[in-house]
Amino acid sequence: MSSLKKILGLKGKGKKSKKLGIAPPPYEEDTSMEYAPSAPIDKSYFGVDEMDTHDPNQLRYEKFFFTVKMTVRSNRPFRTYSDVAAAVSHWDHMYIGMAGKRPFYKILAFLGSSNLKATPAVLADRGQPEYHAHCEGRAYLPHRMGKTPPMLNVPEHFRRPFNIGLYKGTVELTMTIYDDESLEAAPMIWDHFNSSKFSDFREKALMFGLIVEKKASGAWVLDSVSHFK
């Protein structure tokens, strides 16, 4: 997180302007801060009166519409779903996109990978193995990620190369996710997965940077997102 000085544009005292070579104007001079941010934040300060405090034990439910289109091209056919997951999970390497949607995009990438189907060789580009998936619908996600920002109907496209062991190729993803404010019931996002492709759901989710736990009811909950994936 940037320091408050950087956010406010404050610089060290006595530094000269790089453009003019003269002493900086008053607004560039260092000042003593009467308030040093620390937790908990005083709700009386501007802009924090409705700030959500993340309680890791609080279970929330997010309902949304989603679409995911995925194309994976590889130099050779994948043998197992683990090979597929290892390749596709690199889709958000050097991620540039909407930060608030990233955990949900990770889920959609995981979802898309479980529904990939091989394209007939005669139709594949240059005869190389290709896999495609297209999933859309409504769903809800039980999670402990804290309050999420509003999600608008804006598609985002990602294209990333992968080089995993014997496999080299590209992953292309187009994903859309936005808030569902209707009162209609929706299935859990996990119900859209093709679970026949893998046995250890928790392990495969972690490959995509998703840390999930199972409730007493047997339903999966997104606890957090791994910072190492």
UniProtKB/Swiss-Prot annotation:
Residues 1-10 have a biased composition (Low complexity). The keyword Disulfide bond does not apply. Signal peptide: none annotated. It comes from the Viruses. It is a peripheral membrane protein. Forms a double layer around the helical nucleocapsid, the inner matrix layer binding to the N helix and the outer matrix layer binding to the envelope glycoprotein. Plays a major role in assembly and budding of virion, by recruiting cellular partners of the ESCRT complexes that play a key role in releasing the budding particle from the host membrane. Condensates the ribonucleocapsid core during virus assembly. This is Matrix protein. It comes from Vesicular stomatitis Indiana virus (strain 94GUB Central America) (VSIV). The gene is M.
